[in-house]
Amino acid sequence: ISQTRLGGGRVHHAMRTVGSCKRLLDAMSRRAVSRKTRTGTIADYQSVQMQIADSYIELEQFKLFVLKTAWMIDKHQDYRKVRKDIAAIKALMPKVYHDIAQRCIHIHGSLGVSNEMPFVGNLIGSMVMGIADGPTEVHKVTVAKQHLRAYRDVEDPMFPDYSLIERRARAHEMYDPVEEIVEAAE
């Protein structure tokens, strides 16, 4: 019962993390286009572009996952039915937050680790997210167990239905009668 009640809080933390990551992405983007080098700005370097692209992609993926989970909670009105996705966003949240915070610090250079910027606090916050409300590993186990429930009734462990042997057998069952009809028509 307590795990069910915590679901809303976990989604709320994930939404707040989306906001924090968005601020970090904005900060690193502003720094990239404003930090001058001899030939332009650091935004001109592919390594900086890759870090910004990775941060943008990870943030968008995480944001959409959080929105989907919130939509499913609204749809089902039952946290237990969305337990796997709630656990998944809880497990993913500290990694996304950590990776984006680390990139932001890196793009800011020594300024990023100074007490003039909030980024070290973000990095520490990401580590706290991985421990608070249950360690990430516990949530990953929940995701795996919930996911594997759909695969409990395996018919033949020696030759699963996706093996080439089984697929060929099904193809023969489906198409051999058609071949006989075609041959008879000729």
Region annotations inferred by a language model:
Residues 3-186:
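Alpha-helical interface subdomain recognition
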